[in-house]
From Swiss-Prot:
InterPro entries: Histone_chaperone_domain_CHZ. Residues 160-172 have a biased composition (Pro residues). It is found in: Nucleus. Forms a heterotrimer with H2A.Z-H2B, stabilizing the association of the histone dimer. Also, with a lower affinity, forms a heterotrimer with H2A-H2B. It comes from Kluyveromyces lactis (strain ATCC 8585 / CBS 2359 / DSM 70799 / NBRC 1267 / NRRL Y-1140 / WM37) (Yeast). Residues 1-10, 54-68, 121-139 have a biased composition (Basic and acidic residues). This is Histone H2A.Z-specific chaperone CHZ1. One of its GO terms (cellular component) is nucleus. Forms a chaperone-bound H2A.Z-H2B complex that acts as a source for SWR1 complex-dependent H2A to H2A.Z histone replacement in chromatin. The keyword Nucleus applies.
Length: 172
């Protein structure tokens, strides 16, 4: 077993030793990669170099336009004011149209005029109150506190003793 391990190690070491042909091909590859990397570096430098934009031509054009407008200055000012007024009117028209659209989308039949929501049913509360009085169902909700105490006693453990009510005169 130990001999097999030594043989494997020697084989691996022998495989790692470079041949003369491998050395030559590796040297060629490294030289080619160096040339390619320097060429890429030069290309990158030239791409990074940017000239500052020359605005002098633009300035000259603007100066010429200003001179031309100075001769007809009054007419242009009136035109610009009327354009501004037109824009304001257009914006106001658009706003009014939007408001009208909002109001047209609202269905007045869905507006609740009373303070109670009934999920679409129209209820006359006066009539329902009269019907409840006739049936004797008025005042049912008044006795809720007593019902709660009765329900509590029903659910209590029968083996557990009931707590004695505390009297206001006894010291705590």
């Amino acid at each position: 077993m130990a001999e097999e391990i030594k043989d494997k190690q020697e084989f691996q070491i022998g495989a790692e030793e470079p041949d003369s042909s491998n050395v030559a091909s590796q040297a060629k590859r490294s030289a080619e990669s160096e040339l390619a990397s320097t060429a890429d570096a030069n290309d990158k430098k030239s791409k990074k170099k940017r000239r500052r934009r020359n605005y002098d031509d633009l300035d000259e054009k603007i100066a010429q336009e200003d001179k031309a407008s100075a001769t007809s200055g009054a007419n242009k000012e009136e035109d610009s004011e009327s354009e501004v007024d037109d824009e304001k009117l257009d914006q106001m028209m658009v706003k009014e149209d939007e408001e009208e659209d909002d109001l047209s989308e609202i269905d007045s039949s869905n507006i609740i005029t009373t303070g109670r929501r009934t999920r679409g049913k129209i209820i006359d509360y006066k009539k329902t109150a009269e019907k409840l009085e006739k049936n004797g169902e008025v005042g049912k909700d008044d006795d809720d506190d007593e019902d709660d105490e009765e329900n509590d006693e029903e659910f209590k453990d029968p083996a557990a003793p009931a707590p004695a009510p505390a009297s206001p005169t006894e010291p705590k």
